[in-house]
Amino acid sequence: MLAIIFDHTEICFTGDNIVPYRMYVPDVLMAFFFLSGYLFYRPEGFCLRHKLHSWLRGVLMPYFIFTSALALPKAWLHGADGSLSDLLLTILTGQGSWFIASLAVAELLFCLLLWLSRAHWRWLAGAGLFAVALAYGFGTRRLAFEANWWHVNEAVVALPSLLLGYMAHRFDKLGTRWRLGLFALLLVLSLPVNVLVASSSWPSVLVGAIVLPRLFLVKNALSVLLLYLLFTISQRDGVRWVEQMPRWLAAMVSWTGRRSIVYYFFSSGIPTALTAVFSRLGYTYRGCYAEVLVVFLLNFLLITLVTWAIYRYLPWTTGRRKPNG
């Protein structure tokens, strides 16, 4: 989520991506889908009714609440002159927030996949190959729903990441040595892929709201698995490396991660509004990249404050019944 806020800050404040978009944005987006799939797995088994209830409260309901509440301010910030009926149509067709809409569709598709396969790993392996083929077709625009309601194109592209996260959790039995070896192997494999993608001449395709470079499936899979291994590798005493972070930093990352849905709804609007305020005051980007970092920190603090207030005073908007600031 920090990477998404950083990307939106950079675009709003400087007018462009100074750090190449293709180098990290698609990866962190797919990492979110990977984490979603990871959280799907339960040792006691998959319950469709329970998961659909969680999906309705935790994803779909917040989508309608926040996109409805932010529709007019968002239109005003972007200078749009749409009518209320246009705004309503935008929300109902899933265009109010492309990422949350695609997450909702991808999770629903994955629910149906787990239900139909009875979560049997052999069926899931076969379905995974089919999902990869579909993702490649949609990710290269060989296949596409032209209307792209509820950003189904992006959802299909993300489906393998959910399955990868689910399988990673289900078969999470690797010891430290195996994790270190696999991490080193994936790191070596990722280096040439990232060098290729970093080239300005490397082709990419616009799929709905996301730009995907060629080899996106390979790059995304390598990146999310590297992140996963980095956060799960343990020392000899069983303490994970990530647990060696300063407590305040670990607490901040954990707190932010658990509230990512609300963070995302404000990750674009607040950077846009803050940039507009700075512009009115005569402060614009002057070529010093340190300014971007300062503005990013301000955006993160403001979004965190808003998110805290929502979880503290309006928890029902996030699917929770009790305050959880």
What residues fall within each predicted segment?
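Alpha-helical transmembrane segments and their immediate juxtamembrane cytosolic regions
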Residues: 1-325
